[in-house]
Amino acid sequence: MTRSQKEKMLAGEMYNAADPEIQAELLLTGAWLKRYNDTLGDSAERWNGLLLERLGAVGLGAVIRPPFHCDYGFNIRIGAWVYINYNCVILDVAAVTIGDGTAIGPAVQIYTADHPHDPEQRQAGLQLGRPVSIGRHAWIGGGAIILPGVTIGDHAVIGAGSVVTRDVPAGSTAMGNPARVKAGGRLPKS
C-alpha cells in the first residue's frame, strides 16, 4: 500500500510539500490562524478554546499570545502552564513538544522543517521534518531560533537571540550563535 504524502511527512520521511492534501491542511490552518490572531484583545480562556480546535494537545493554563504562526498546528503539543509570548513561529511539519511550565519569549522561532541537501530533490519540492522537544520548566529567551531535530532538556535556559543548532542538556544555560552551553551550566542567582 502506498502511503500518502501527509503520512510520509508525519513519519519524518521525505515528502512532497506541493501535495494537494498537504496544501489543503495549510489552508485550513491559515483560516484558523486568522481567527486566532484576531483575538488579540480577548481573554486567555478564548485563546485556549481556539487552541484546542487545532493543536495536538494543550495543557491546563497554557497561553499563546497572538499573533502566532504555525504550519499545521496538529503536530504541536504544549503542556500545562506553558506561556508563549507574541510573534512565535512554529514550523511544525514534525512533532513539537513543549513541557509543563515552560516560558517562551517574544518572537521565538521553532523549526522542524528541513530540506534535502540534494538540489534536485529540493527542486522537486521534497522536504522532511525533524522533531523538536523542549523539556519542562525551560526558559527560551526572546528572538531565539531552535533548529530541526533539537532537544532542550528540563529546566534549561536559552539566552535571547540564540540560535540553537544542537541539543541542550537539562539544567544548563546556552546562548549565542550558534548557542553554546555556558561553563557552570546555570545563570548566577541575583
From Swiss-Prot:
It is an enzyme of class 2 (transferase). Pfam families: Hexapep, Mac. Belongs to the transferase hexapeptide repeat family. One of its GO terms (cellular component) is cytosol. InterPro entries: Hexapep, Hexapep_transf_CS, Hexapeptide_acetyltransf, Mac_dom, Trimer_LpxA-like_sf. PANTHER family: ACETYLTRANSFERASE C18B11.09C-RELATED, SIALIC ACID SYNTHASE-RELATED. Keywords: Acyltransferase, Nodulation, Plasmid, Repeat, Transferase. The gene is nodL. Its EC number is 2.3.1.-. The keyword Signal does not apply. The keyword Repeat applies. The lineage of its organism: Bacteria, Pseudomonadati, Pseudomonadota, Alphaproteobacteria, Hyphomicrobiales. GO terms for molecular function: acetyltransferase activity; O-acyltransferase activity. This is Nodulation protein L. Acetyltransferase implicated in the O-acetylation of Nod factors.
